[in-house]
Amino acid sequence: MRLSWILTILSICLSALAAATGAEGKRKLQIGVKKRVDHCPIKSRKGDVLHMHYTGKLEDGTEFDSSLPQNQPFVFSLGTGQVIKGWDQGLLGMCEGEKRKLVIPSELGYGERGAPPKIPGGATLVFEVELLKIERRSEL
């Protein structure tokens, strides 16, 4: 009887551990503000054209891309699928001149396929970004 009770408790503990591990397996986007600005007349929103400087690294610190060496900002329309989901979500509500650090799980980056040869499948991405300019598109 006592052995049966111990096995039941052990089974419950293992089930709880498996459930907790599964919940942690799906990571969330992390957004850290590295530099705030005092004056922010407009914040980025879906449909805006953003001019960004960025440096992208893997979790181990290996740099895979950057706009800085060419001093050529990356320009794209926010929230329209032109960039990875982690950017479309992580750059909302930014001010011109603001800097952020984004830690993007693979589900919001390049997923299990990666972007060979520089980004392996399942990679978490770390971006340091700076919003240089917002072009607000007129609403239709």
From Swiss-Prot:
Catalytic activity: [protein]-peptidylproline (omega=180) = [protein]-peptidylproline (omega=0)
Keywords: Endoplasmic reticulum, Isomerase, Membrane, Rotamase, Signal
Keyword presence, Transport: no
Regulation: Inhibited by both FK506 and rapamycin.
Limits of the PPIase FKBP-type domain: 47-135
BP GO terms, sorted: chaperone-mediated protein folding
Major subcellular site: endoplasmic reticulum
Broad class of enzyme this protein falls into: isomerase
Subcellular location field: Endoplasmic reticulum membrane
Motif (Prevents secretion from ER): 137-140
Function: PPIases accelerate the folding of proteins. It catalyzes the cis-trans isomerization of proline imidic peptide bonds in oligopeptides.
Identification of the protein by name: Peptidyl-prolyl cis-trans isomerase FKBP2
Source species of the chain: Mus musculus
Lineage, uppermost ranks: Eukaryota, Metazoa, Chordata, Craniata, Vertebrata
